[in-house]
Design a protein with these regions (language model features):
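Conserved Class I S-adenosyl-L-methionine
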Residues: 178-231
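Short alpha-helix
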Residues: 156-173, 179
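A conserved beta-strand element that flanks and buttresses the S-adenosyl-L-methionine
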Residues: 88
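Class I SAM-dependent methyltransferase SAM/SAH-binding core
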Residues: 27, 31-74
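A short glycine-rich, Lys/Arg-flanked "PGG" loop and its adjoining helix->strand segment in the class I
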Residues: 100-115
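Conserved alpha-helix/loop element of class I SAM-dependent methyltransferases that forms part
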Residues: 1-14
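Conserved class I S-adenosyl-L-methionine
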Residues: 15-22, 115-145
């Protein structure tokens, strides 16, 4: 979905103004900048931003990648209102204090017609993973816990169902365009089995693509990817 948005924007030649909230060392930002877009990376970690600066400099992208230190809720203070064509918020909503407040901040910096790429941890995947690990009590806890956690030792702060994350997005004033599952079955397949099967990895990738937007498989994904637009 994200590649399609960037490719569509690239046809005009001007490129996009992109904000990568929680972008860290630039795993998404640097390739996006290399594609001709302008990227502002917001992250609370000075070490990650220093690594981003080095990575950008090595590729001659200093003019396209701009680093800001702060949290997601700082976004409206650090980035002008209605200035972003695209905001990436990947694996961030799980750890913020208030997901609704965080998405409201994103809405403020998006231009009308601008898009949000949101990636969050899926609740159902945690339930299934704990059950397959022989931990039915933890699976039951993840199923009923308001935050989708399987117990005190769970390192995740919260997980989402497709319905919950879509409700948050629409509550922030955005319109959901697409919802896809990421790693629907990939985390359940032993890599040794794929290595032993000729073409196994390619076949798994094709299966992932086929399952990613189909219910009920999408709901089982390790992560949920939501693409939304500001009306």
């Amino acid at each position: 979905m994200l590649s399609a948005v960037l490719a569509e924007a690239g046809t005009g030649g001007a490129g996009l103004d992109v904000v990568d909230a929680g972008g860290g060392t630039g795993g998404f930002a640097v390739p996006i900048a290399e594609a001709g877009h302008r990227v502002t990376v917001l992250d609370p970690s000075p070490d990650s931003l220093a690594a981003l600066a080095r990575r950008s400099a090595e590729r001659g992208l200093e003019h396209r990648v701009h680093a800001l230190q702060g949290d997601l809720t700082d976004l409206p203070v650090l980035v002008p209102a209605a200035s972003a064509d695209l905001v990436l918020c990947h694996s961030v909503l799980e750890v913020v204090d208030d997901p609704a407040e965080a998405l409201a901040a994103v809405t403020q910096v998006l231009r009308p017609g601008g898009r949000l790429s949101l990636l969050v941890a899926g609740r159902a995947a945690a339930v299934l993973a704990r059950a397959l690990a022989g931990r039915p009590d933890e699976a039951s806890h993840a199923l009923t816990d308001p935050a989708g956690r399987w117990g005190r030792a769970d390192g995740a702060v919260r997980r989402f169902s497709p319905e919950a994350v879509q409700a948050l997005v629409t509550g922030a004033g955005l319109r959901v365009e697409q919802v896809h599952g990421v790693r629907v079955v990939a985390d359940l397949v032993p890599s040794a089995l794929l290595d032993a099967e000729p073409g196994g990895h390619a076949a798994l990738l094709a299966l992932e693509r086929a399952l990613s937007d189909r219910a009920p498989f999408r709901e089982l994904a390790t992560q949920l990817h939501v693409l939304a637009v500001r009306p």
